[in-house]
From Swiss-Prot:
This protein's GO CC annotations: cytosol
Species: Alteromonas mediterranea (strain DSM 17117 / CIP 110805 / LMG 28347 / Deep ecotype)
Protein name (Swiss-Prot/TrEMBL): Shikimate kinase
Alphabetical UniProt keywords: Amino-acid biosynthesis, Aromatic amino acid biosynthesis, ATP-binding, Cytoplasm, Kinase, Magnesium, Metal-binding, Nucleotide-binding, Transferase
Cofactor(s) the protein needs: Mg(2+)
Residues that hold substrate according to the record: D36, R60, G82, R139
GO biological process, one term: amino acid biosynthetic process
Catalytic reaction(s) noted: shikimate + ATP = 3-phosphoshikimate + ADP + H(+)
Keyword Secreted included in the entry's annotation: no
Subunit and interaction comment: Monomer.
Annotated binding of ATP, by residue: G14, A15, G16, K17, S18, T19, R120, Q156
Top EC class, one word: transferase
Coiled coil segments of this chain: none
Pathway note: Metabolic intermediate biosynthesis; chorismate biosynthesis; chorismate from D-erythrose 4-phosphate and phosphoenolpyruvate: step 5/7
Length: 171
């Protein structure tokens, strides 16, 4: 690979962005970053606590700053937070600074993959499946808008999805 290019993974929670991103980075010998983990590292607090203290708007402002910093690097794979694309500036940066891959998954798979995860503040309520449906209705068009490639993650291993991405991108 002559030129180091960035690959940015977008998609809903439970799509496998972090797991697939690590495999992708390993295969391509790129650095891997997860925007949520980077926010936690910089603040010393977990995402749920930031949501509780600052609300979603405060969290999104932090997320935008972190994504701006990370997308300025070269030769990385970045797993973004599921809601990062709601911010127009984030969508613009992702599009301008790398290849954007939308990892698509069904609501059923999201429920199965996230049901025991207490670190997802938006799902800590009576009906997480309905929350996921509502989020999908709002966010899926934004994922599609920003995506250079769309890859379904439902019935494949993370490594198989990573290899499919490499093949689609032509790396």
């Amino acid at each position: 690979m002559a030129e180091k290019r960035n690959i940015f993974l977008v998609g809903p929670m439970g799509a496998g962005k972090s797991t697939i991103g690590r495999h992708l980075a390993d295969e391509l010998h790129l650095d891997f970053f997860d925007s949520d983990q980077e926010i936690e590292r910089r603040t010393g607090a977990d995402i749920a606590w930031i949501f509780d203290l600052e609300g979603e708007d405060g969290f999104r402002a932090r997320e935008e700053n972190v994504i701006n910093d990370l997308t300025d690097k070269q030769g990385i794979v970045l797993a973004t937070g599921g809601g990062s694309i709601v911010t127009k500036a984030v969508r613009n940066r992702l599009s301008a600074r790398g290849i954007v891959v939308y990892l698509q998954t069904t609501i059923d798979k999201q429920v199965a993959r996230t049901q025991r995860d207490k670190r997802r503040p938006l799902l800590q309520n009576e009906d997480p499946e309905q929350v996921l449906r509502d989020l999908a209705e709002m966010r899926n068009p934004l994922y599609e808008e920003v995506a250079d490639y769309i890859v379904d993650t439902d019935d494949q291993s993370a490594r198989a999805v990573a290899n499919q991405i490499i093949s689609k991108i032509g790396l």
